[in-house]
């Protein structure tokens, strides 16, 4: 692999693709709930497979990995910190020394066609995962890479929504009056801009049941207190942060990688710059 590629910045600080995610540092990588995952058919180990998206490297992407995205699979691993030049074959060849690799994939940026610096592998035997984790350091194409266990996230019911484009002057009473017609409200969050000490133009509403959310989402826009508001499902902070893996995060800790400015393949999985107080809890997708 060329040395030049090693000096280029890489997008590897929080991600999700086809239902797979890298978790915050110190936690196991997870896969999102049904509400957060992109629409795709899923199947058990003995069922069918999902269709691989475009932009895959070295041919077809791992159907078996995609098919098990919402299921626990002890043989599946997330691999972060990959070089742009690392191919699917390179990834498979490296991990084959730990056991038989039945499937692997490298996630690609659909806009640039470049690797996003992370991928997934699926071992035939889960004992191979433990062998990988037992090794203190892994290097591939001149870079320190970071393999972790991949785990499925539980499908919790969706009860929380994001309401954007709301007039900051709209009272909680008016908000509750409008959305209360869809179902019983458990809580309303009114984020404050810490610099201006004023209400922000969005709120989060948690219903006691899941059905009201479905009713609200039948329309994308709602008029609340004279404002045309956009409604979306609110995502847990962990899911939002992982989506930043491929959306502009540039490495912070190279952990022994060449140079300190390139940042390709940062290991700060799940960490993103805060752009607003609402990221403390939820973010729409």
UniProtKB/Swiss-Prot annotation:
Residues 25-43 have a biased composition (Low complexity). Ubiquitous. It is found in: Nucleus; Cytoplasm. GO terms for molecular function: DNA binding; RNA binding. One of its GO terms (cellular component) is presynaptic cytosol. Residues 1-65, 239-285 are annotated as: Disordered. CDD domains: RRM1_hnRNPAB. The modification Omega-N-methylarginine is found at residues 250, 255, 258, 275. The modification N6-acetyllysine is found at residues 220, 271. Transcriptional repressor. Binds to CArG box motifs, single-stranded and double-stranded DNA, and RNA. It may be that repression by CBF-A is a result of competitive binding of CBF, a putative positive factor, and CBF-A to the same or overlapping motifs around the CArG boxes. This is Heterogeneous nuclear ribonucleoprotein A/B. The gene is Hnrnpab.
């Amino acid at each position: 692999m060329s040395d030049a590629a090693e000096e280029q910045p890489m997008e590897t600080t929080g991600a999700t693709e086809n239902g797979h995610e890298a978790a915050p540092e110190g936690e196991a990588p997870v896969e999102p709930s049904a509400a957060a995952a992109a629409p795709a058919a899923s199947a058990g180990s003995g069922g069918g497979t999902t269709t691989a998206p475009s932009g895959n490297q070295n041919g077809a992407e791992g159907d078996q990995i995609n098919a098990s995205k919402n299921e626990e699979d002890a043989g599946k691993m997330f691999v972060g910190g990959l070089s742009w030049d690392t191919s699917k074959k390179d990834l498979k060849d490296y991990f084959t020394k730990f056991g038989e690799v039945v499937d692997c994939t490298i996630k690609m940026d659909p806009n640039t066609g470049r690797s996003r610096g992370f991928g997934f592998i699926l071992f035939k035997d889960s004992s191979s995962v433990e062998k990988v984790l037992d090794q203190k350091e892994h290097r591939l194409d001149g870079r320190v890479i970071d393999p972790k266990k991949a785990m499925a996230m539980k499908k919790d019911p969706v009860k929380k929504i994001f309401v954007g484009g709301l007039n900051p002057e709209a009272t909680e009473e008016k908000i509750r009056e409008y959305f209360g017609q869809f179902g019983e409200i458990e809580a309303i969050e009114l984020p404050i801009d810490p610099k201006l000490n004023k209400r922000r133009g969005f709120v989060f509403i948690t219903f006691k049941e899941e059905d009201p959310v479905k009713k609200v989402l039948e329309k994308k826009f709602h008029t609340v207190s004279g404002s045309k508001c956009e409604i979306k499902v609110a995502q847990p902070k962990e899911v939002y942060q992982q989506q930043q893996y491929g959306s502009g995060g540039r490495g912070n800790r190279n952990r022994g990688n060449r140079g300190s400015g390139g940042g390709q393949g940062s290991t700060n999985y799940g960490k993103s710059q805060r752009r607003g107080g609402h990221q403390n809890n939820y973010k729409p997708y």
